[in-house]
Amino acid sequence: MSQNIQIGTRKRSRANMNNSTTTGPANNTSSNKTFLDNFEETRTNKLLDEMFARQNSFLTDNLRNSLDLNQADNPLRPRQHQHQLFLDNENAIELDEEPRIINTTINNSNNHNSSRVDEDADDDIIFIKEQPIQFSSPLILPSSSSINNNNNIVTSNNPGCGTAATSNSTYITTPKKFKKQRTISLPQLPLSKLSYQSNYFNVPDQTNAIVPRVTQTENELLHLTGSCAKTLEGNKAVNLTIAHSTSPFSNPPAQIASLPQSNLKKQIGSSLRKFTSNGSSESASSNKSNFKTDKDGHYVYQENDIFGSGGRFVVKDLLGQGTFGKVLKCIDNKYEPNYVAVKVIRAVDRYREAAKTELRILQTILNNDPQGQFQCLLLRECFDYKNHICLVTDLYGRSIYDFMCSNGIARFPGSHIQAIARQLIRSVCFLHDLGIIHTDLKPENILICDETHIAQKLPLKTVQSLSKRRREASKGKRKILKNPEIKIIDFGSAIFHYEYHPPVISTRHYRAPEIVLGLGWSFPCDIWSIACVLVELVIGESLYPIHENLEHMAMMQRINGTPFPTDIIDKMFYKSKHKLGNSPSDLNSTVIKHFDRKTLSLQWPEKNKRGDTITTEKSMKRVLQSCDRLDIYISKVLKQDYGDSLSINWNLPPEKNWSLINSKLAWKRQTHSSSSSTTDELDKETFLFWYWFIDLLRKMFEFDPTKRITAKDALDHEWFNLGILDDGIATYNNTQG
């Protein structure tokens, strides 16, 4: 079923409209005016009809096969309101005030009231789209928020939402700030509209009601170390089932029980003689060779290895490995579907303890989300086999990282980025309400549920510009997923917020500044990591491709367009001086020494005592040439798809940004010049989509963790009310290969 689109006009009555003639001697030319008015009205109606037809055709073609949520085989078919459609005026966004396809100006005779802000100040053309949704998404206000008489949200002491700036140099957005005028509602993927409601959760400390936390206070972050005792106490309560090796008897127990008594004695005697003469039975020998452990406690991967009680699991592939152990693709001979993923932990006490923490976290997630609706990997079962803790989970597709590496164009469509962002933030919101901090969010730990995709052959010139590895992996094609549903995995580094906090967490590229600076860390570190992931989906590569602290901090300042706030640097010095909390062992040598104690500013490029620059030229290029302020950096990448006219300045309001872009587009139309074939595809809806995306990133990349936007506030951000027409919408659940 294709989407139904209704197009209509919203008409308003005005007291002083001159659309009727008056009688009397003063109106001698009334008949002429009536004729002209009728002529202009007919001409205008004809132009409007043409515009409606073109818009209707444009939107219908883009939506016809894109968002068919009523297919029986669609896994994302709405579970709630399944047979209801709604008129999506809520998601309306601004259009250009001067539509290009209409050259006729309709004058308002009530000019003396034009400056008056009135709800009926103009005749808007509204495009109303019927769009199914999966869940309702009510507005959740922070505890410190209220609604004033003008139906505006008033927030006090809530840094996540932002406030109006007093300086003209910086523009800071607030929700519902702009009046919506000529509007059009573009489609969104169902995953982009997933809702989140605060619930009552069951957590290990028997606390049933978790109060959604707005942020962390300064004192919490400064002194936060967690409790080792609570971690050890929790791990002691973990009970693991011991999976025994296969019996030395060749017959299974059921078969042995069915043997006559005389035959049973012969069978036992024969097996014992064979066992004692050879030192082990054939089965025991087979088991020993099937599941080997090296001197470092790692399981030695071997295809077709058999392990688990009764030889339940058969190893078929190696999915991943690390310091913790290995992840295997296995056949489960007990349950269907047969293929599962088994995480085999190193047989070392340190990693076994960490696995017990992971097990408690996975069990908490399972208890509170048995259906897996919050995009977290669910634990099937666990057991202990030959001193290896084994965690069994469902098997999904490749990670986002692997998918990007095998793609000719690593960048994701905007609609897919929004869908993935919604799932990630919503999942983290759920985890944070459970008191869980993931600490290691990155593309490698985000799995794609369904890898089916549409492959588009790339132009020869583009293929030739690819690296040899990417060219071979992608076969010269761009892959666009049909369904961007994801699962978050690897809770091996996750912690409960009240338990022990290691001094260093997260993979370097996704590490928050409070961790680098040796400050306390908590829930906000996950938000920073998500922001890094989202930028990577846009630009197709890591935002921070670095391996040491000084370069990392210099890049952070350049991308944020501002130095580190002096108050958090002052806290860093204070914490180091008084030895508060946990600090990285190399904090003084790799971080603190690069800050001036008087100005509290980062000293980069690095200089020696004589004032000579000692930072390498290669490092200088990485910082100065490979990145820029985030809005400028992303704009450069988006120009590849939308032309040179797209430019976003986060210090200017959206209307000012669009005015500048529109001027560029008008100049190009007049001069008939275009540097890109896609330049004319840029419209205001597309610009606003990316503008508010960058605005959300800016709030997620806040240096001060106490002011960084929370997961719950991020779900209410304006960006999630906006749609976009792109390849991600067009290929959603497309039946063609």
From Swiss-Prot:
Pfam families: Pkinase. It is an enzyme of class 2 (transferase). InterPro entries: CLK_kinases (IPR051175), Kinase-like_dom_sf (IPR011009), Prot_kinase_dom (IPR000719), Protein_kinase_ATP_BS (IPR017441), Ser/Thr_kinase_AS (IPR008271). Its EC number is 2.7.12.1. Residues 277-290 have a biased composition (Low complexity). The active site is at D440. The modification Phosphothreonine is found at T562. GO terms for cellular component: cytoplasm; nucleus. It catalyses: L-seryl-[protein] + ATP = O-phospho-L-seryl-[protein] + ADP + H(+); L-threonyl-[protein] + ATP = O-phospho-L-threonyl-[protein] + ADP + H(+); L-tyrosyl-[protein] + ATP = O-phospho-L-tyrosyl-[protein] + ADP + H(+). Phosphorylated (auto-) on Ser/Thr/Tyr. Residues 15-33 have a biased composition (Polar residues). Keywords: ATP-binding, Kinase, Nucleotide-binding, Phosphoprotein, Serine/threonine-protein kinase, Transferase, Tyrosine-protein kinase. ATP binds at L319, G320, Q321, G322, T323, F324, G325, K326, V327, K343. GO terms for biological process: negative regulation of transcription by RNA polymerase III; regulation of RNA splicing. Belongs to the protein kinase superfamily. CMGC Ser/Thr protein kinase family. Lammer subfamily. This is Dual specificity protein kinase KNS1. The gene is KNS1.
